[in-house]
């Protein structure tokens, strides 16, 4: 709308109590330093120390003298005082600066004849809010306030551009809206797609000589909002040479352009992202202070809104990694739950099971859920995909059926089958998770206390009432020792109680893989063997699944702790659990053909006689990943020797499965360096386990 050399004149009007002065002062602080806005001082026949707005104090004689010399652009009288705006404001407009002036609605028509590019900004608020503000001033009684609010105002001339800014909330919110309205009229830019990829970061590019905005002013740690056609995106700013972008354009990186979803040439408004109100709280946490729920709500909200650069978020997360009190973990869990999609159930009890993971092959969820569902309790289980392991529960379940369910499909599946095993990426995953994961994973941050808040917030959002948590511990597990596991169990149960959840957290042995298969299809083979009472069913997998299923069934008053184990065994032995898995698979969307273990194989054998004393599950899982798991769901490792088994040189330790010769060769080559097995003979250890572990 505006170009350099032709500024706009913003005439701010509104009833008494609308807060014009506050908004103008706030805008002055935000926009004044740019040098592109002039905030007019009204000349008023009122002493300088009379209070109210900062004005040019003139006597009546002085005012009349300026008027006689043509020094006022416009002038008017109100409440026994004379008001005027200096004619020099026209010079500012001619120089391309935008004028913001506090004015009277009655003078709009006269001003429209004197200035080009007039924009009237009408500040509004409900009568109740106006009355409360006027009462708070203490200048007028109730009768005068009522009379002031009943005054009728003339309509604006049809030829004048009028924008309304509601100021019915906090001063900060009102100032943000006011500034955004001003900038929206002055900073309109054409959208250009830049052939630049910036990864997760949204980047907006401005030519250094941009003629619509002062581009260098937008450099720094702050962000900008780009708004147009009902869509918006938040981005950091980078400058480019004038030859790379038109002077009236804003360029977006490929990722930002796609996220905004508007075509090239669309008109965008550029505004500064408001400074986070929570910055003081964030800095206190970085310095080691304890924050309450309200402070965390502000900090987390501003992080999700993209108001902090990654460096400050990283500082906050490092501080949280070092020190979170029990009360802070509870506060964070409550706050995080608000950023996840909530699911409510018409059920007296909704149960769930979670594992801290890290133990290869421990696919007990696919046995526990069918047992519990066969009993009749609702168990809407959502699980993750593998990040660094050879398979996650979602990867394994996906060999049989769809897992990318939305909340409606989860509800429908549970109604039909009493349970589900779905991927959490479309359900409990939130915008906060995206931000946190992008920063914590490269930095290697893995706070168990932060994890407690995250996990329980998702259970709360999922509508769970009762949750059992598996805490495997061991030298190579995520939780290293029994003491740490028991402390984590205490925290889970305490925070769960604070959220209104019934939580039982149980430390378990995580020193070795569970089951035989490592990789999606091979792990599902083990699951089906257990559910079908196959002679090859891994006993450790069956026992752990029965243990956790019985802990869940014990919550049912009709079963109780004394009968829970027998009930779980009955449901497994009778085939009811196997039938329940079939119902779940059918409800989620069965594949026409399940994924089978890959056909190309390579057997890794023992080099010495002896007894298997140790299996490095992470080393073995690493070989499985080289074979193609988890993306290739048929790839993986089939363990032939378990801890305690006696082997002779040449006996198979495990079999590698792969779908391509190249993957098989890569995995077999890694196994030559270290196969992950420790074998003892006559007290002497023969180890081919990754020495870095």
Swiss-Prot record:
Catalytic reactions on record: alpha-D-ribose 1,5-bisphosphate + ATP = 5-phospho-alpha-D-ribose 1-diphosphate + ADP; thymidine + phosphate = 2-deoxy-alpha-D-ribose 1-phosphate + thymine
Annotated Gene Ontology cellular component terms: cytosol
InterPro entries for the chain: GK/Ca_channel_bsu, Glycosyl_Trfase_fam3, Glycosyl_Trfase_fam3_N_dom, Glycosyl_Trfase_fam3_N_dom_sf, Nuc_phospho_transferase, P-loop_NTPase, PhnN, PYNP-like_C_sf
EC number(s) from the headed UniProt entry: 2.7.4.23, 2.4.2.4
Keyword rRNA processing: no
Region of interest (Thymidinephosphorylase), residue spans: 194-693
Record has ATP-binding as a keyword: yes
Ranges for region Ribose 1,5-bisphosphokinase: 1-193
Keywords recorded for this protein, A-Z: Alkylphosphonate uptake, ATP-binding, Glycosyltransferase, Multifunctional enzyme, Nucleotide-binding, Transferase
Gene Ontology molecular-function annotations: 1,4-alpha-oligoglucan phosphorylase activity; ATP binding; ribose 1,5-bisphosphate phosphokinase activity; thymidine phosphorylase activity
Pathway: Metabolic intermediate biosynthesis; 5-phospho-alpha-D-ribose 1-diphosphate biosynthesis; 5-phospho-alpha-D-ribose 1-diphosphate from D-ribose 5-phosphate (route II): step 3/3
One biological process term in Gene Ontology: pyrimidine nucleoside metabolic process
Binding residues for ATP: 14-21
Record-linked HAMAP family: PhnN, Thymid_phosp_2
Function: Catalyzes the phosphorylation of ribose 1,5-bisphosphate to 5-phospho-D-ribosyl alpha-1-diphosphate (PRPP).
Similarity comment text for this entry: In the N-terminal section; belongs to the ribose 1,5-bisphosphokinase family.
Protein name: Bifunctional ribose 1,5-bisphosphokinase-thymidine phosphorylase
Organism: Azorhizobium caulinodans (strain ATCC 43989 / DSM 5975 / JCM 20966 / LMG 6465 / NBRC 14845 / NCIMB 13405 / ORS 571)
Lineage of producing organism: Bacteria, Pseudomonadati, Pseudomonadota, Alphaproteobacteria, Hyphomicrobiales
């Amino acid at each position: 709308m505006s170009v350099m050399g032709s500024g706009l004149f913003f005439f701010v009007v509104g009833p008494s109590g609308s807060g014009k002065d506050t908004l103008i002062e706030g805008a002055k602080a935000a926009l004044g330093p740019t040098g592109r806005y002039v905030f007019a001082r009204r000349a008023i026949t009122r002493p300088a120390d009379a209070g109210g707005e900062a004005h040019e104090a003139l006597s009546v004689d002085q005012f009349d003298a300026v008027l006689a010399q043509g020094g006022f652009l416009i002038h008017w009288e109100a409440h026994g005082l004379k008001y005027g705006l200096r004619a020099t404001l026209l010079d500012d407009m001619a120089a391309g600066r935008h004028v913001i002036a506090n004015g009277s609605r009655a003078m709009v028509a006269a001003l429209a004849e004197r200035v080009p590019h007039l924009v009237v900004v009408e500040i509004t608020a409900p009568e109740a809010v106006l009355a409360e503000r006027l009462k708070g001033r203490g200048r007028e009684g109730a009768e005068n306030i009522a009379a002031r609010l009943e005054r009728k105002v003339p309509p604006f001339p049809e030829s004048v551009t009028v924008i309304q800014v509601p100021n019915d909330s906090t001063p900060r919110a009102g100032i943000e809206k006011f500034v955004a309205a001003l900038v929206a009229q002055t900073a309109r830019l054409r959208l250009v797609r830049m052939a630049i990829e910036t990864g997760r970061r949204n980047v907006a590019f401005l030519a250094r000589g941009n003629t619509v905005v002062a581009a260098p002013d937008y450099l720094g740690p702050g962000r900008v909002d780009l708004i147009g056609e009902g869509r918006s995106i938040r981005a950091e700013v980078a400058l480019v040479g004038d030859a790379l972008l038109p002077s009236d354009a804003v360029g977006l990186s490929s990722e930002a352009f796609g996220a905004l979803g508007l075509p090239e040439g669309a008109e965008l408004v550029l505004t500064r992202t408001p400074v986070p109100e929570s910055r003081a709280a964030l800095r206190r946490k970085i310095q080691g202070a304890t924050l309450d729920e309200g402070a965390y709500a502000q900090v987390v909200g501003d992080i999700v809104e993209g108001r902090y650069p990654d460096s400050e978020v990283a500082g906050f997360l490092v501080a949280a990694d070092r020190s979170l009190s029990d009360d802070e973990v509870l506060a964070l869990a409550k706050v995080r739950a608000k950023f996840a999609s909530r699911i409510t159930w018409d059920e007296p009890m909704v149960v769930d099971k979670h594992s801290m993971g890290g133990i290869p092959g421990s696919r007990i969820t696919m046995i526990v859920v069918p047992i519990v569902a066969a009993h009749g309790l609702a168990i809407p289980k959502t699980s993750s995909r593998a990040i660094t392991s050879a398979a996650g529960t979602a990867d394994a379940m996906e060999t049989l059926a769809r897992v990318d369910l939305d909340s409606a499909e989860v509800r429908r599946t549970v109604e039909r089958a009493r349970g589900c095993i779905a991927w959490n990426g479309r359900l409990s995953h939130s915008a906060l998770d995206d931000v946190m994961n992008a920063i914590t994973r490269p930095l290697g941050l893995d706070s168990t206390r932060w994890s407690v808040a995250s996990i329980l917030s998702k259970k709360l959002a999922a509508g769970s009432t009762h949750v059992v948590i598996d805490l495997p511990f061991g030298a190579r597990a995520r939780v290293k020792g029994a003491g740490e596991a028991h402390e984590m169990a205490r925290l889970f149960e305490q925070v769960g109680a604070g959220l209104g959840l019934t939580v039982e957290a149980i430390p378990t042995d995580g020193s070795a893989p569970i089951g035989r298969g490592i990789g999606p299809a091979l792990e599902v083979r083990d699951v089906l063997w257990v559910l079908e009472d196959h002679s090859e069913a891994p006993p450790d997998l069956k026992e752990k699944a029965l243990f956790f299923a019985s802990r869940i069934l014990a919550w049912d008053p009709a079963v109780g702790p004394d009968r829970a184990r027998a009930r779980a065994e009955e449901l497994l032995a009778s085939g009811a659990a196997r039938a329940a898995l079939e119902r779940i698979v059918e409800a989620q969307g069965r594949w026409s053909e399940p994924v089978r273990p890959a056909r190309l194989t390579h057997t890794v054998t023992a080099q010495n006689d002896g007894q298997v004393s140790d299996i490095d599950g992470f080393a073995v899982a690493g070989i499985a990943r080289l074979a193609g798991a988890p993306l290739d769901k048929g790839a993986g490792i089939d363990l032939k020797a378990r801890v305690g088994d006696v082997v002779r040189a040449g006996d198979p330790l495990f079999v590698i499965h792969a779908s391509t010769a190249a993957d098989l060769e890569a995995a077999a080559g890694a196994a030559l360096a270290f196969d992950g097995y420790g074998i003892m003979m006559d007290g002497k250890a023969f180890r081919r386990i990754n020495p870095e572990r």
